[in-house]
Amino acid sequence: MSDSAWQAVTHENCGNVKGPFYHGTKYDLEIGQLLVPGFVSNFEEGRVSNNVYFTALLEPAIWGAELSTSLTGAEGRGYIYIVEPTGTFEDDPNLTNKRFPGNITQSYRTRQPLKIVGKVNDWTGHAPEVLQQMIDGLKEKMRNGLAVIED
């Protein structure tokens, strides 16, 4: 899709976006469980997240699993689930139109539950040095007050 063809995903038109959708996390969950907002953020200490975040691409879900695990000091590499939105959703404003125009990561957020319908077991994480680079970059942004989450 070219930049000129990109159209924002809103609560009104999100039905046009087709999955599968993925959610990466540090939590070992069960198929059938609902992911709901209102829990402590994995990315900002002391913040309660008003949204649940998900993506139509596996790569951002891998980052979600690895970062939520690493940033909170949890064991393991994290988990990736196949999820279905139960309500409307919109582009994740934390990634959309930031470094690149549009929503190239196909990342979304919702205030409605996501239902876990499957688990991705066969995924390859990032090399340790690549993951550490990302963590160092995020921590630097946090120190400089630049890692504000729009929730």
Model-derived features: positions:
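Solvent-exposed, non-transmembrane amphipathic alpha-helical segments
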Residues: 42, 72-75
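Short active-site loop/helix that positions an aromatic residue
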Residues: 58-72
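Active-site and NAD+-binding cores of ADP-ribose-processing enzymes
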Residues: 26, 33-34, 74-151
